[in-house]
């Protein structure tokens, strides 16, 4: 599966973009990317702001979610690094598979993180340790960078999948360090 998957993904992507020429692709996909880049953060912000009102009472134990999130983020970081190494070694098909996998894991993380805010007790998940200022600085910078990484990641993937490799390289120079 590991050997076959990059080729299957490559074939699917080529079929999707084959029927539309480049200008039509941009006319369709650029507005979609821009819209998603605005809608997703707004939806996440709304869910986070109103999570006290939207809290889901559940008898299930979701205390494993922070560990799950750490595993997702750690695996994503490994995949991003591996993808960087692959493209430096000119293994573009495997690079594409690894980067799409990293994007999928990041998407699963976002969905799971929002879900965790709806099911976990907020009073027990707030950080109240002696490094509150440091924690808040890291948290706020993380939130601001996450706003930038979504459109950058979407445009990076789009330019790479459509074969616009110069544009892809220019965007990835910003996307990679922010995403990491």
Q: Which residue stretches match the model-derived regions?
A:
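Alpha-helical membrane insertion/targeting regions
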Residues: 17-180
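Aromatic (phenylalanine/tyrosine) cluster motif
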Residues: 2-7, 17-18
């Amino acid at each position: 599966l590991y050997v076959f998957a990059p080729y299957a993904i490559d074939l699917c992507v080529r079929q999707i973009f084959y029927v539309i020429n480049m200008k039509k692709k941009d006319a369709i996909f650029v507005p979609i990317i821009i819209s998603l880049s605005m809608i997703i953060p707004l939806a996440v912000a709304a869910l986070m702001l109103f999570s006290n009102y939207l809290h889901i009472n559940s008898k299930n134990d979701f205390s494993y979610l922070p560990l799950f999130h750490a595993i997702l983020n750690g695996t994503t970081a490994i995949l991003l690094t591996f993808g960087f190494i692959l493209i430096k070694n000119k293994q573009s098909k495997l690079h594409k598979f690894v980067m799409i996998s990293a994007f999928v894991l990041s998407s699963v993380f976002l969905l799971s993180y929002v879900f965790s805010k709806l099911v976990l007790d907020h009073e027990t998940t707030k950080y109240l340790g002696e490094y509150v200022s440091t924690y808040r600085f890291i948290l706020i910078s993380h939130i601001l960078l996450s706003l930038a990484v979504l459109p950058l990641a979407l445009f990076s993937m789009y330019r790479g999948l459509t074969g616009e490799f110069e544009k892809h390289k220019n965007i990835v120079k910003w996307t990679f360090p922010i995403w990491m």
